Curated annotation (Swiss-Prot):
Entry protein name: Phosphoglycerate kinase
Record keyword Cytoplasm present: yes
PANTHER family per the UniProt record, alphabetical: PHOSPHOGLYCERATE KINASE (PTHR11406), PHOSPHOGLYCERATE KINASE 1, CHLOROPLASTIC-RELATED (PTHR11406:SF23)
EC class: transferase
Location(s), subcellular: Cytoplasm
Pathway: Carbohydrate degradation; glycolysis; pyruvate from D-glyceraldehyde 3-phosphate: step 2/5
EC nos: 2.7.2.3
Membrane-crossing residue ranges in chain numbering: none
Entry's Gene Ontology BP terms: gluconeogenesis; glycolytic process
Gene: pgk
Keyword Nucleotide-binding: yes
Length: 398
């Protein structure tokens, strides 16, 4: 079911109204409390600016880290308020709590087009418990609710689900609208052929995605550490590579179900130890030496994967091809990132499905060349699995 978007609200709907926006400002800080990557803050700007330009009083709420219902000074959102003020070109009021009299007063003092940022929502135990009383307190300061935090949309928390029960209008922000358009679109009505690339170290964390994508896609390329569980299922020797022995039967059944849709690497780069300075060599997947572990896909596999991606209508990528944190074993991941960047230019819809793949395309410097980069980790996976996300379900239907 399509959801109502903030873009459906006009100046008449918004001017002078208090709008509570759940954003995802869970940004990394260094030891000095300086933000090292402000991507998530910048991603929320279109929604915030849309609201301020139409005269709304904007109240932002986010979590940072996992304080588990306690106040943790190193997880305060003060540096976020400072950075947001710079990006918006206006002073953002920073509250020292997320509910209570001082917060109510700060919001009452907001003028049209002004912005306040609440303190870390997870300092309050009611947030993660989805406590109705906490949700009611959050909603007391809002005429309209906007969810633009895709990264937490798969959680039924006070600020993502509970608050919608106490506000008349609940809509998706521009970022969530774009996520739904691309991720749901890729699964429900993709431009074909649809090729999916799934990587990462464990089959167990990607089972749901692999099963759903197998039904929907024309080809499924598998890389990363999980390939060794598939090889073992085929009776190959995998040396010292990572294997989930309890998932071998599952890998077998996925291969049977796939009816030739799954493409596995034919060669891998193996290492004598798990370290950036390990000795490395490329071997066939039928000749992995004892004691050596596969840490990347080989050059032949890269070629085969590139051919499979050539001319595809839609490509979805989730998970790296190898241990891309070590430069020696980042070759496969970087090659896929560059291939997808090139494919976008020739008309392929390229979707980077959250998590480590996002870090990979950023590392290679091709993030701006993709059609869509998802801001969710678990939320992206669950949407690609075809699951309903509580934070989305709770919004008003279009």
């Amino acid at each position: 079911m399509a959801k109502k978007s903030v873009a459906n609200l006009t100046e008449a709907d918004l001017s002078g109204k208090r709008v509570f926006v759940r954003v995802d400002f869970n940004v990394p800080l260094n030891e000095s409390g300086v933000i090292t990557d402000d991507t998530r803050i910048r991603a929320a700007l279109p929604t915030i600016k849309y609201l301020t330009e139409k005269g709304a009083k904007v109240i932002l709420g986010s979590h940072m880290g996992r304080p588990k219902g306690q106040v943790v000074d190193s997880m305060r959102l003060t540096p976020v308020a400072a950075r947001l003020s710079e990006l918006l070109g206006q002073s953002v009021t920073k509250c020292d709590d997320c509910v209570g009299d001082a917060v109510n007063q700060a919001i009452a003092n907001l003028g049209n087009g002004q912005v306040a940022l609440l303190e870390n929502l997870r300092f309050n135990p009611g947030e993660e418990k989805n406590d109705p009383e906490f949700a009611k307190q959050l909603a007391a300061n809002a005429d309209i609710y906007v969810n633009d935090a895709f990264g937490t949309a798969h959680r039924a928390h006070g600020s993502t689900e509970g608050v919608t029960h106490h506000v008349d209008t609940s809509v998706a922000g521009l970022l969530i609208e774009k996520e739904l358009q691309f991720l749901k679109g890729a699964i429900e009505a993709p431009k074909r052929p649809l090729v999916a690339i799934v990587g990462g170290s464990k089959v167990s964390s990607k089972i749901g995605v692999i099963e759903t994508l197998l039904e929907k896609c024309d080809k499924l390329l598998i890389g990363g550490g999980m390939i060794f569980t598939f090889y073992k299922a085929q009776g190959k020797s995998v040396g010292g590579s990572l294997v989930e022995d309890d998932k071998i039967d599952l890998a077998k059944s996925l291969m049977e179900k796939a009816q030739g849709k799954i493409l596995l690497p034919t060669d891998v780069i193996v290492a004598d130890k798990f370290a950036p300075d390990a000795e490395a060599k490329t071997v066939s997947v039928d000749a992995i030496p004892d004691g050596w572990m596969g840490l990347d896909i080989g050059a032949d596999s890269v070629k085969v994967f590139q051919e499979a991606l050539d001319g595809c209508g839609t490509a979805i990528w989730n998970g790296p091809m190898g241990v891309f944190e070590f430069d020696k074993f980042a070759v496969g991941t970087e090659a896929i990132a560059k291939t997808l960047a090139g494919a976008t230019e020739t008309g392929t819809v390229t979707i980077i499905g959250g998590g480590d793949s996002v870090a990979a395309v950023e590392k290679v410097g091709v993030a701006d060349k993709m059609s869509h980069i998802s801001t969710g980790g678990g939320a992206s996976l669950e949407l690609l699995e075809g699951k309903e996300l509580p934070g989305i379900v709770a919004l008003d239907d279009a």
